[in-house]
Curated annotation (Swiss-Prot):
PANTHER family: CHROMOSOMAL REPLICATION INITIATOR PROTEIN DNAA (PTHR30050:SF2). GO terms for molecular function: ATP binding; ATP hydrolysis activity; DNA replication origin binding; lipid binding. Residues 71-112 are annotated as: Domain II. Residues 113-329 are annotated as: Domain III, AAA+ region. Plays an essential role in the initiation and regulation of chromosomal replication. ATP-DnaA binds to the origin of replication (oriC) to initiate formation of the DNA replication initiation complex once per cell cycle. Binds the DnaA box (a 9 base pair repeat at the origin) and separates the double-stranded (ds)DNA. Forms a right-handed helical filament on oriC DNA; dsDNA binds to the exterior of the filament while single-stranded (ss)DNA is stabiized in the filament's interior. The lineage of its organism: Bacteria, Bacillati, Bacillota, Bacilli, Bacillales. Residues 330-451 are annotated as: Domain IV, binds dsDNA. Residues 1-71 are annotated as: Domain I, interacts with DnaA modulators. The keyword ATP-binding applies. Oligomerizes as a right-handed, spiral filament on DNA at oriC. This is Chromosomal replication initiator protein DnaA. One of its GO terms (biological process) is regulation of DNA replication. The keyword Cytoplasm applies. ATP binds at G157, G159, K160, T161.
Amino acid sequence: MSEKEIWDKVLEIAQERISNTSYQTFIKDTQLYSLKNDEAIILVSLPFNASWLNQRYSEIMQAIIYDVIGYEVKPHFISEDELASYNNVNTQEVQEPQVQHSSIDDKTWGKEQFNMHNTFDTFVIGPGNRFPHAASLAVAEAPAEAYNPLFIYGGVGLGKTHLMHAIGHHVLSNKPNAKVIYTSSEKFTNEFIKSIRDNETEAFREKYRKIDVLLIDDIQFIQNKEQTQEEFFHTFNELHQNNKQIVISSDRPPKEIAKLEDRLRSRFEWGLIVDITPPDYETRMAILQKKIEEENLDIPPEALNYIANQIQSNIRELEGALTRLLAYSKLQGKPITTELTAEALKDIIQSPKSKKITIQDIQKIVGQYYSVRIEDFSAKKRTKSIAYPRQIAMYLSRELTDFSLPKIGEEFGGRDHTTVIHAHEKIANDIKSDPTFKQEVENLEKEIRNQ
């Protein structure tokens, strides 16, 4: 594939895995500048965007690029302003020939895995995360002696990954020779599949079972993957039996992960389970203030107050709003005021009268309209009287919410994201070809928005 084809595919996958607001604001217009020497240089329009993407989206973009090209590279976002200095630094470097990368990279035990900004010192503590922070610090201070496994769950962008990186940094600061691996369940699955294909399963097992600390993110994505669950079960057992620390994160507690083997579920519950909840107003303000101090920015308190009052869901969106404001101010050439802040964020802030639409809201309205029970949206029934309303509900979930395709599939009985894509395409085509049906869907959309 050419670099353009690679990046087109990366963007396609990113649109599925990243919230629509973040994708449209920060990812959509990025360009792949170069792909060499195990590094992907990605061009963005503004330095603010580059800094924020490097801090917050490096891991997920690294996983997506891996899925597309089949070997690991580290993404690095740079702005157009930084491009000249980057080229100057690299003009004298000799380009190394491409080599075939093994699916097993056993040199990923050090601090290079972790975002340098994600430490315990930069983690802002509040009522919603105090207990997870304390548990993570205890684990980092004494791996396998405090809580093993440590299971952290909570919504997107609340700080689970930050805590996992902080644990990694802390362990390696205390024990530089410790073997620590941070991965996601998706990356674990992809490496496992590739190891089977390349006849490297023993090397794969050596990598993941002969370590001191395993940090695995988004474990919920191993649901429905029987072979991966089998492999992870044995990996978990060997690490635990050898008194090695395991830290797991998820968007839900073990008991709510559908199609997870009971033997894995019970092991996840052996140690300590902690949940992170959305930050309160004081914590949101503290996060914004810490951010502007780190970046040495001058933003009026009333603008920060506006952001903290309007963005309440998670930290990632909070910091994203700040980055968007800075970019907007620079592009408009205007000083930051409350009025400019409201103008900059109008597309991502709901009006006071509006309510964030959930998939359950959509299922309820569509179910009432077509006389389908809520539970039937998640059932395996394929009769047309149920299957077609289910496709309509999937279509509306994609159109009216920021949930990723896998998340939408989960809410419809753990269906694969390709099923959601198919449903969206089918309903979109039916809308184009049938004016009566188009009006029907528009009426449903109005009812959902107005409930």
